């Protein structure tokens, strides 16, 4: 393990009916701004529970924080918060509402333009916030991260401030979520884990097993949730998986990647794609592109999560990546750029942005603009089937990977065939 300091001060309040705890969690003398997204909280009962819990308190409401929160909307909330001397924020919604509220908490005490904070990447001076989570996905309810967009300039950047003081998670509020939103949340959770797991081998047996436990849980519950999204037990597992995937617990002392996320952010900024959907497209492409470098960890992942134990290493790597893509597809998500109507112009613009910023992601800081181009090229539609039933493994490798990785894998396969 690498050296680390772990700190997560968020109080987690979990279970049915726990929104009523709000009155005990927010000091009575606070001037509260409650932030919301659209109107779904008024149809699923969440709004009524929140208002009832805060009866008699001094609060104001701010509505309209959109998916991928936009700086123009957040500036309006910041201005309102300053005018009303707000000193406590309550985010009621999913990751976008919580992310946006984190910037609001930093923007209210800040004298300048809040976009400056986003470009800087962090803020230390904030007012406290709590959350009522309605959509499992981002883990924002128990971390200090956020992602903020500027639609005017097609930009989207990560931003770090303070952890929520508390977060309330009631699985029953997820029962009315649309299937697509659930699918994107499952994909987001899965890739959050993989960004911290799919790096180097033997850094920490414990962190690997914690990560694998979340992955195995997601693989188990995803098809069941598709059949019954109003099962309290299943949605509880989903909610806690999403929280545990990005609250720092599985990142202690290990390398992290995040290249997939940074590429995905650009797809959202340019095309408005839902975050989880971008990850379902980009992550298999990342694995295909970096299969040689990540080979040992992919083999471990394939064996422990998908039960891939037969065949030479190159075959197992290929099958593991195929199973990963199949998982996303079975959620009902697209897994190729072409399916989303994204072509070479977008790829070149993402590469340009990476190069302009001098971006370098991945556990070794080697995913540059050029590597991002290769990853995105590997996210295009397959020209031929990679179904292994009745198809030679040579064809699987030839149709699944790009030149440098493909050559290595074919050499491995030919050696094992005695050619």
Give the location of each predicted region:
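ATP/NTP phosphate-donor binding region
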Residues: 1-88, 337
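A glycine/threonine-rich phosphate-anchoring loop and its flanking beta-alpha core
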Residues: 10, 20, 110-206, 300
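Short Gly/Thr/Asp-enriched flexible loops that form oxyanion-binding sites at enzyme active sites
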Residues: 78, 97-111, 142-143
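Glycine/serine-rich anion-binding loops at beta->alpha junctions
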Residues: 86-102, 134-140, 270-273
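Active-site segments that bind and position negatively charged phosphate/pyrophosphate groups
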Residues: 196, 200-323
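C-terminal charged capping/lid subdomain of soluble metabolic enzymes
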Residues: 308-389
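Acidic/polar low-complexity segments and flexible, solvent-exposed patches
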Residues: 390-419
